[in-house]
From Swiss-Prot:
The entry's keywords: Periplasm, Signal
Disulfide cysteine pairs (residue numbers): none
Locations listed in the record: Periplasm
Record family assignment: Belongs to the UPF0312 family. Type 1 subfamily.
Domain of life of the native organism: Bacteria
Gene3D superfamilies assigned to the protein according to its UniProt record, in alphabetical order: Lipid/polyisoprenoid-binding, YceI-like
This protein's name: UPF0312 protein VC_A0539
Region forming the signal peptide: 1-22
SUPFAM superfamilies assigned to the protein according to its UniProt record, in alphabetical order: YceI-like
Length: 189
């Protein structure tokens, strides 16, 4: 009887770290602790940088089982901001991303691969400009822990390159692709 109780107790204690590791997070856009940034070649002479000001999403992260992790992000394409109102109006127009017709871009992961040393490969489907294509985000786990307000946070950074023609977006000059830089901090639900 004593051995049985010890075995049950040991099993319960050993399961605690695994249960505590799996967590669901809301991306902290309200606290401005997340950003979706872009960089695009401008006529072969320089780069234009910008961001999307409105987006939301969630992710699930389990450091003990990276493959069980997932992410979903929704981006309001009308919130594109390159710090130049006339250019933003043109990029949002039907000439390019047609934000009035395709006001939301969505990324849903299909697989998260642990590459070791905090490096991750996040594979998923991006719906942009009415077309859904598979993409890969090269990501890095930045850190996790308790914030000053008693909540739990987890943070990541990632990059990917999008070929505009893959999403039916007009290519102009040297701007055949856009580089994306992502910074995500989540607050545990």
């Amino acid at each position: 009887m004593k051995k049985t109780l010890m075995a049950v107790g040991l099993a319960a204690v050993m399961s605690i770290p695994f249960a505590a590791n799996a967590a669901d997070y809301v991306i902290d856009t309200k606290g401005a602790h997340a950003s979706i940034n872009f960089k695009v070649n401008h006529l072969g002479y320089s780069y234009i940088k910008g961001r999307f000001n409105k987006f939301d999403g969630e992710f699930s992260y389990d450091p003990a089982n990276i493959a069980a992790s997932s992410v979903v992000v929704n981006v309001d394409t009308r919130s594109l901001d390159s710090n130049h109102a006339e250019r933003d109006k043109h990029i949002r127009s039907a000439d390019f991303i047609d934000a009035s017709k395709y006001s939301t871009a969505t990324f849903k992961s299909t697989e998260v691969v642990d590459k070791g040393n905090g490096q991750l490969e996040v594979k998923g489907d991006l719906t942009l400009h009415g077309q859904t294509k598979p993409i890969v985000i090269n990501a890095e786990f930045i850190g996790a822990g308790q914030d000053p307000w008693g909540g739990q946070r987890s943070g990541f950074a990632g990059t990917t390159r999008l070929e505009l023609k893959d999403f039916g977006i007009q290519v102009m000059g040297a701007s055949s692709y856009v580089d994306m830089e992502l910074h995500v901090e989540g607050v545990q639900k």
